[in-house]
């Protein structure tokens, strides 16, 4: 530094004007002059204090302005490239003519030689230009030292006080910061190099600025190259580098231990998880086995299920006993539900099979007619504000079937005796019933919801009518007291509430004047009209007697469901023996056959007749033809003929002259009380009203034998009840 300040810089200022004049036309001179002019302009724009300008032009007249600018830059110790270039050109001339010699300290030459011989590379990084550096070491006071130098760097690579400059040099020489040692006498440059990671040694030469204690503490300070502990510095540098590497490795290790710990934990967790997985798998397997057992139990009876559960609980470990118990308790209700459902399903299937067997024995034609009629009835009800009708079906107990069979046998054996004992009584009752049936108009078949008792009801032919009048009249009162605003009608088919022996026949359908006469052969329309006229005459003569006997009638209550009335008109079960014996008796008269007795029976579980077909083998078929439902009977007298069942469903009470029944709304032609019919409808409170016509002797035989009469229900369209 002292050499530059004392020798080089004064030499450049003294020889710059001479150099410019001697070399003005040289390209190097022209280039450096242009660079100085640009620098002056920049300083002017930057408003640097004391900034000078260089006039434009190529004449030598501007040389004095150039000299003034160089002096101003040197006074500021500026290290601009243009200034250093011009100084180097002037120094080169002085080095060539020997005017000046490059000054180096005595220890420099020996150190450079030793370091080079040791295989180390030496580079020069100076604020002076590369050319000036070379000239100085080439023309040094100790000879040519350029041979010890591997390279030169000036401010073109960057300022010496900037970190990036040193990083750029390291990149250029392909070395790491730990492998490099930077020697300088300027603390600012030392700090920049240190920031870049280089090893730094500060040289304290005579004439340099004093170093502070902090600087000495921060850096290694030496006074000569010989004092530089290069080996130790290199070792320390290597050690430092190694230390840095070790530190970095430790830092990496410090970062890695958690990973290793995690790995250990993972390994530990893996073992723990393996154990837990094994434990979890066992309950899972048990649960699976439990599920399988539960499924098997659902298919098996409840007793088998209990055994499986007990075996599973015994096989389970004590630790899982509570869980298994809980699962078993949860599975039990489901199994019971499944068992009950299976049993109920089996029962339903059995009933369906029975229904199918009964249905197969019936003719297809009545079914189709009934289905069509039912469909029409549903459409009519959907259009009008009709009420919902529910039907509750109950299975027929086996005991009822057995009673029916026994009663059939009793009827077969004692039919003749019964006919003889009650023949006289029946004749009288039949005669009394004739005028009542003729006098009672068809309009009275409609049951109203008022509490006024029916004063004129047809006579009931029943052996139990006299025995139990008090019992059945309260029931009739209850039926009439039912509210007329009923919105739903339920048809409940239940087992008979009274024994089969006490089956009663009531006349609840006073439409005898509308029914055809029951004869072995159907009478023509003219005879029917004639018979009706005669009956009306007789009815007028005996009003008092008819009224008195009508009061003794014990009928099953019929509950009105707001405009809906259901009546039953089905064929009466007949016995071949009775038919033969009754046909042979001379006491029978043709007028008796003309008599119409309407019988109403409580729906019984013992009856199993649909559409006129009975299980005892004697059958009648009620075949609806063109709106008529008539009982077709063989003419040989083997079976009792049933009169035409004419049911008015329009509620006008007028019988039809031709015996046609309003079948358009009839949906119960195939109903039975014993087997639930597919299209059956009935009345509320579990009872149906049956309208059946039989000759007097046959009816008497049925009453004595306590025979259950089959009934079918025929719903009528809504009729507004009189309030």
From Swiss-Prot:
Signal peptide: none
Keyword Cytoplasm (UniProt): yes
Record localization: Cytoplasm; Nucleus
Superkingdom of the source species: Eukaryota
GO MF annotations, alphabetized: acireductone synthase activity; magnesium ion binding
Keywords for the protein's UniProt record, in alphabetical order: Amino-acid biosynthesis, Cytoplasm, Hydrolase, Methionine biosynthesis, Nucleus
Catalytic activity: 5-methylsulfanyl-2,3-dioxopentyl phosphate + H2O = 1,2-dihydroxy-5-(methylsulfanyl)pent-1-en-3-one + phosphate
Pfam families named among the record's database cross-references: Hydrolase (PF00702)
Annotated pathway: Amino-acid biosynthesis; L-methionine biosynthesis via salvage pathway; L-methionine from S-methyl-5-thio-alpha-D-ribose 1-phosphate: step 3/6; Amino-acid biosynthesis; L-methionine biosynthesis via salvage pathway; L-methionine from S-methyl-5-thio-alpha-D-ribose 1-phosphate: step 4/6
Enzyme Commission number(s) from the entry: 3.1.3.77
Similarity-based family: Belongs to the HAD-like hydrolase superfamily. MasA/MtnC family.
Protein name, as recorded: Enolase-phosphatase E1
Source organism of the structure: Culex quinquefasciatus (Southern house mosquito)
